[in-house]
Regions:
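Absolute protein N-terminus
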Residues: 1-2, 70
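Intrinsic disorder/low-complexity segments enriched in polar/small residues
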Residues: 16, 20-21, 35, 61, ...
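A short, charged, amphipathic alpha-helix used as a generic interaction element across diverse proteins
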Residues: 26-44
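N-terminal acidic leader/helix
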Residues: 2-32
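Short, mixed-charge low-complexity intrinsically disordered segments
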Residues: 39-70
């Protein structure tokens, strides 16, 4: 399985699919996801999209689930 797509489900049930090719700091997202899923304390993370103005942030209080998808 290629691990190049991550599904984020927010507490308001909004779902976002993040692909490695669309985010500059995808590895930081993967590290954040692993820490989050292990129950560790995680800081806010700003993800930088490849398109101008496509940045977004995630934090522990607004994410319900985060996982790799096929």
């Amino acid at each position: 399985m290629t691990k190049d797509r991550v599904r984020i489900v927010y507490r308001n049930n909004y779902e976002r699919i993040v692909e490695e090719s669309n985010v500059r700091n995808f590895n930081a997202l993967v590290e954040w996801m692993e820490d989050f899923n292990e129950g560790n304390l995680v800081p806010s993370l700003v993800l930088f999209g490849r398109d101008l103005g496509s940045n977004f942030s995630i934090n522990k209080s607004n994410v319900k689930t985060i996982e790799f998808i096929d």
